[in-house]
């Protein structure tokens, strides 16, 4: 439990064949959790005469119960209400985010933003030079050329190609997700280079993209059948818009347009196709920005769009958090083989 997301950090290359042997020989049964909580993992293992049980609920590192041979070693109560994000996140608005990005002392954010630029750029480069997954980043560059818009999609996708398919390079995350951290940052970095933006402009734009992504994710929760890349792609569009000189009006419309375009995308787990979904999400964010630059926008009443950026964000959050619960259940049933497609 103390290792959190690094429980596999000490696995060596020599041990990998042993893992393959174990997986091919062990009896592993998977079933759907009976809890209504969208994030519940219960694992029970047997070895010789010993048994162990671990339960994680609500978030990726929240271990609430540990048992060994029937003895309870940890029992921590959990409720969905207690797992709500802090008030500081729930009170965010797009307008406040932009004001903060304009005024923040960069020394207060320099360390994490600098790491995000360094680490996320490095793994994107690995995805573009190595052979990982479906190679979506490489395919985008080979197929659609070297425009800044295509490079923004390709670099974000390439980072996911590597991340989802075994690359051990670190990533600076957003909302608990490496994919969302790369999606929110890499397009902004690519555009900053193209526009020859100063370091200060890049850092402030990344503050916008990261905080908009967090704002969009806050109402959805840590896990949903709604693809989190959609939120990060809208955040990236907001950050790029900021680089072009956009402020509240332009960024608010960019976010609304992006959410209207891409909010139907499903999450069906972390795997190679995430890279293609990221490319789609970045495309939606950039198109949302270009729409407003060309005096075009979606209006309240256009499908799920509600007048006002905060109202649209709340509407999308409601769909993702509550409306897609049964979608999540159906996806899980299909993935674990409880239901077959007829």
Report residues per predicted region.
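Helix-loop-helix junctions within the multi-pass membrane cores of secondary transporters/permeases
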Residues: 198-220, 225-243, 249-251
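Acidic-glycine-rich active-site phosphate/pyrophosphate-binding loop
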Residues: 147-166, 198-216, 256-264
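Signature of multi-pass transmembrane helix bundles
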Residues: 20-166, 333, 337-342
């Amino acid at each position: 439990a103390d290792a959190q997301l690094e429980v596999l950090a000490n696995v060596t290359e020599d041990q990998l064949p042993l893992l393959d042997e174990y997986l091919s020989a062990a009896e592993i049964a998977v079933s759907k959790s009976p809890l209504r909580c969208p994030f519940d993992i219960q694992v029970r293992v047997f070895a010789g005469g010993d048994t162990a049980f671990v339960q994680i609920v609500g978030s990726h590192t929240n271990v609430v119960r540990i048992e060994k041979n029937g003895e309870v070693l940890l029992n921590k109560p959990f409720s969905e209400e207690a797992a709500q994000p802090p008030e500081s996140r729930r009170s965010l608005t797009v307008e406040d985010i932009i004001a903060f990005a304009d005024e923040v002392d960069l020394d207060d954010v320099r360390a994490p933003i600098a790491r995000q630029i360094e680490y996320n750029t490095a793994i994107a480069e690995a995805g573009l030079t190595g052979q990982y997954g479906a190679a979506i980043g490489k395919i985008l560059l080979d197929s659609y050329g070297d425009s800044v818009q295509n490079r923004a999609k390709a670099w974000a996708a390439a980072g996911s190609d590597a991340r989802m398919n075994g690359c051990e390079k670190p990533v600076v995350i957003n909302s608990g997700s490496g994919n969302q951290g790369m999606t929110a940052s890499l397009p902004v970095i690519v555009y900053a280079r193209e526009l020859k933006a100063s370091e200060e402009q890049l850092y402030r734009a990344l503050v916008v993209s990261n905080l908009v992504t967090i704002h969009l994710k806050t109402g959805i929760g840590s896990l949903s059948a709604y693809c989190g890349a959609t939120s990060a792609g809208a955040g990236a569009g907001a950050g790029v818009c900021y680089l072009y000189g956009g402020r509240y009006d332009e960024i608010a419309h960019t976010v609304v347009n992006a959410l209207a375009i891409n909010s139907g995308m499903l999450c069906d787990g972390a795997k190679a196709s995430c890279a293609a979904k990221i490319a789609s999400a970045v495309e939606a964010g950039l198109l949302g920005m270009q729409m407003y630059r060309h005096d075009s926008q979606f209006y309240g009443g256009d499908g799920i769009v509600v007048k006002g950026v905060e109202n649209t964000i709340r509407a999308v959050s409601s769909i993702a958090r509550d409306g897609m619960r049964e979608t999540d259940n159906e996806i899980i049933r299909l993935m674990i083989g409880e239901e077959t497609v007829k």
